[in-house]
Amino acid sequence: MPSASLLVSTKRLNASKFQKFVSSLNKSTIAGFASVPLRAPPSVAFTRKKVGYSKRYVSSTNGFSATRSTVIQLLNNISTKREVEQYLKYFTSVSQQQFAVIKVGGAIISDNLHELASCLAFLYHVGLYPIVLHGTGPQVNGRLEAQGIEPDYIDGIRITDEHTMAVVRKCFLEQNLKLVTALEQLGVRARPITSGVFTADYLDKDKYKLVGNIKSVTKEPIEASIKAGALPILTSLAETASGQMLNVNADVAAGELARVFEPLKIVYLNEKGGIINGSTGEKISMINLDEEYDDLMKQSWVKYGTKLKIREIKELLDYLPRSSSVAIINVQDLQKELFTDSGAGTMIRRGYKLVKRSSIGEFPSADALRKALQRDAGISSGKESVASYLRYLENSDFVSYADEPLEAVAIVKKDTNVPTLDKFVCSDAAWLNNVTDNVFNVLRRDFPALQWVVSENDANIAWHFDKSQGSYLKGGKVLFWYGIDDINTISELVENFVKSCDTASTLNSSASSGVFANKKSARSYSTRSTPRPEGVNTNPGRVALIGARGYTGKNLVSLINGHPYLEVAHVSSRELKGQKLQDYTKSEIIYESLQIQDIRKLEEQNAVDFWVMALPNKVCEPFVETIQSVHGKSKIIDLSADHRFVSESDWAYGLPELNDRAKIANAAKIANPGCYATGSQLTISPLTKYINGLPTVFGVSGYSGAGTKPSPKNDPKFLNNNLIPYALSDHIHEREISARIGHNVAFMPHVGQWFQGISLTVSIPIKKGSLSIDEIRKLYRNFYEDEKLVHVIDDIPLVKDIEGTHGVVIGGFKLNDAEDRVVVCATIDNLLKGAATQCLQNINLAMGYGEYAGIPENKIIGV
């Protein structure tokens, strides 16, 4: 066997990696979420450690031990650095009430109260505040049966007469008090909320008696509890408008809470730890509703509460982003579900049906397959063309597996002794939603043995080790396989792999095979963009803003208000529904809360010319899919990062000063660049062909860049005389800048104490002696000579001068004495040219207006 490193797949960290992990956890994680700091010696008193905007007090006698126990508990459940990062990324990025909705079955409180309280106490001590709602079904049944009354159900819904209602109410209050008391005994502040949250009408008074159909959810009691630093503990009792108490199934009530709060996690705790297949007696690990719901509901064992639970979960997920899911688990697996990729119990999600194909003609279209393949590293880097690969497939014996939207596509070649997974191109959404696991499970089912190759630097390398039986490292690539026990077959596999690596090295190719890789597309902005299209359209344009409550939405509304042709037709925000759109004078516009069906109807009626998706990352896809399904005439611009890394044949990248303006003008869908990414690209691009190393970008933004959700990064008091570094490596803008200029960059963002505006200091290594300082200044002036929104100066630009203006100022050029490094400074208003102004430029181009229509001349520096 050739000499190289034979790797053994392991699922646990070794001692060395564990030490590094603990070290990194101590530095980056514990400080961020522990309820008290780790200090030495233990006798030091811990007081008034602030968590969010509530105050938590820990006594000196138990503070250290409680924190130590919490950290040990966390380490036992989070076994990889990736899962630590997942915790930091997700659970510190949302408001506290958006963390999780946890529905607790009544049997859990009776049988597992201590475990439940311990798990909730753990979450509390790491600064997380789930909304807890519990049932009381077993207790009610037991009390009724003790009275000689048989519990009565129709379609899984308890018939609740007045006597039963009295029992239900008493049981709810008893169980609520038991849970709150158990939590308080563990030092957790908990608030019983037994009424006042759900307003309901009768579901069917004649049929079900005192059973409610929830019409609205009052958020204030829950938000007040969390703000005060107490876990909200709810029952599912509801009231009519006149005060009549009604019984509501706890699963249904939990679903209504999830619709209102849109939490990161929706968890149903029951004593079985999931849904049990009544035919086999086995726990179901995953239910993909789009594919399995109809057949599942026909099963004889799906009845009563199980049928109601599945139906309610489906109705809930139909109105949440496709990435949402519901987990049904036991209390012992709660932390595993919240903090690990593997999860536990039964996960229910909408999912997609997987389609098996064996010819190109079976795909929805060649263009659809082409777009999916653009995600492959070898193709996106230009080392292989889509056309040549498709021609290769036409003459190959292959089979492919993919979900319906082609977010995950696996192509297996069958012309070798051991079939080869030749391509497996997956979007970020596919990884996030575990579509990759679905596809791989099908591969295992259909192929007893399989081989594939991955770059050792792949972000998901641990996932591949987990899926494989063996592996072999050579030249920065890892060969994986499973299902092979014969040593001669393994030797042959490795020999062929080594030969291919040696051949690739000879051809000076350092890229991976492309399977699962995540490399950027190399592009260059060293040449100017195409001429600016003339604005010839003077017809009115109707704009619909989805998610317009943030700073960017407000600035865009202000710009549209001064635009000669554009008008706001619809503005959607769940929080502001019913309120008047402020600072818009062309007409009276009232905030709506547009749902999927509303958007489809508007698109069918041709009521909108341009849709603006002003939503957080990973949220807009259901809206985009709905608009596209109508095949109407409208266009879409996405202000999130969701579509900045896809093929430009699908989403044009909307940076007019650097990208092809004609491409933007002709696009049906436009990805609006990020604020930091815009300023950084404009600062680096004139020197692209001179780069000789890793450019570094030191950026400081005003706190408006941290959004409107409360956090230390947008708290003026916390920021006073302060500067907060964050996401110092692998920030999404680092990827965006690198992908667009065709060179890796290092990006280090910070938040400053001012409101809006970004300052960038960019260090660019160049070939020694290739440019003089005068040549550099001239290069920049010539590069942006005809760009109205880019102003080049000699002095260092200042944030106070750029705030409220609509362009980018570049200056402060400095060449070091060795003449091998250039420093350039730039400023940009993150809310305007970094977001709203750029959005308007793109809309203008796509609508055929003048590119700068609606942008105030007196707010453009240099004009």
Curated annotation (Swiss-Prot):
<keyword id="KW-0597">Phosphoprotein</keyword>
<dbReference type="Pfam" id="PF04768">
    <property type="entry name" value="NAT"/>
</dbReference>
<dbReference type="InterPro" id="IPR001048">
    <property type="entry name" value="Asp/Glu/Uridylate_kinase"/>
</dbReference>
<keyword id="KW-0055">Arginine biosynthesis</keyword>
<dbReference type="InterPro" id="IPR041734">
    <property type="entry name" value="NAGK-fArgBP"/>
</dbReference>
<comment type="similarity">
    <text>In the C-terminal section; belongs to the NAGSA dehydrogenase family.</text>
</comment>
<protein>
    <recommendedName>
        <fullName>Protein ARG5,6, mitochondrial</fullName>
        <ecNumber>1.2.1.38</ecNumber>
        <ecNumber>2.7.2.8</ecNumber>
    </recommendedName>
</protein>
<dbReference type="InterPro" id="IPR023013">
    <property type="entry name" value="AGPR_AS"/>
</dbReference>
<dbReference type="Pfam" id="PF01118">
    <property type="entry name" value="Semialdhyde_dh"/>
</dbReference>
<keyword id="KW-0547">Nucleotide-binding</keyword>
<dbReference type="InterPro" id="IPR006855">
    <property type="entry name" value="Vertebrate-like_GNAT_dom"/>
</dbReference>
<comment type="pathway">
    <text>Amino-acid biosynthesis; L-arginine biosynthesis; N(2)-acetyl-L-ornithine from L-glutamate: step 2/4.</text>
</comment>
<feature type="domain" description="N-acetyltransferase">
    <location>
        <begin position="353"/>
        <end position="505"/>
    </location>
</feature>
<keyword id="KW-0418">Kinase</keyword>
<dbReference type="GO" id="GO:0003991">
    <property type="term" value="F:acetylglutamate kinase activity"/>
</dbReference>
<dbReference type="InterPro" id="IPR036393">
    <property type="entry name" value="AceGlu_kinase-like_sf"/>
</dbReference>
<dbReference type="InterPro" id="IPR036291">
    <property type="entry name" value="NAD(P)-bd_dom_sf"/>
</dbReference>
<keyword id="KW-0028">Amino-acid biosynthesis</keyword>
<comment type="similarity">
    <text>In the N-terminal section; belongs to the acetylglutamate kinase family.</text>
</comment>
<keyword id="KW-0496">Mitochondrion</keyword>
<dbReference type="InterPro" id="IPR011241">
    <property type="entry name" value="NAGK/NAGSA"/>
</dbReference>
<comment type="pathway">
    <text>Amino-acid biosynthesis; L-arginine biosynthesis; N(2)-acetyl-L-ornithine from L-glutamate: step 3/4.</text>
</comment>
<keyword id="KW-0521">NADP</keyword>
<dbReference type="InterPro" id="IPR004662">
    <property type="entry name" value="AcgluKinase_fam"/>
</dbReference>
<keyword id="KW-0560">Oxidoreductase</keyword>
<dbReference type="GO" id="GO:0051287">
    <property type="term" value="F:NAD binding"/>
</dbReference>
<keyword id="KW-0808">Transferase</keyword>
<dbReference type="GO" id="GO:0005739">
    <property type="term" value="C:mitochondrion"/>
</dbReference>
<dbReference type="InterPro" id="IPR000534">
    <property type="entry name" value="Semialdehyde_DH_NAD-bd"/>
</dbReference>
<dbReference type="GO" id="GO:0006355">
    <property type="term" value="P:regulation of DNA-templated transcription"/>
</dbReference>
<dbReference type="InterPro" id="IPR000706">
    <property type="entry name" value="AGPR_type-1"/>
</dbReference>
<dbReference type="GO" id="GO:0006526">
    <property type="term" value="P:L-arginine biosynthetic process"/>
</dbReference>
<feature type="modified residue" description="Phosphoserine">
    <location>
        <position position="359"/>
    </location>
</feature>
<keyword id="KW-0511">Multifunctional enzyme</keyword>
<feature type="transit peptide" description="Mitochondrion">
    <location>
        <begin position="1"/>
        <end position="65"/>
    </location>
</feature>
<dbReference type="GO" id="GO:0003942">
    <property type="term" value="F:N-acetyl-gamma-glutamyl-phosphate reductase activity"/>
</dbReference>
<feature type="active site">
    <location>
        <position position="675"/>
    </location>
</feature>
<dbReference type="Pfam" id="PF22698">
    <property type="entry name" value="Semialdhyde_dhC_1"/>
</dbReference>
<dbReference type="GO" id="GO:0070401">
    <property type="term" value="F:NADP+ binding"/>
</dbReference>
<dbReference type="GO" id="GO:0005524">
    <property type="term" value="F:ATP binding"/>
</dbReference>
<dbReference type="GO" id="GO:0006592">
    <property type="term" value="P:ornithine biosynthetic process"/>
</dbReference>
<keyword id="KW-0809">Transit peptide</keyword>
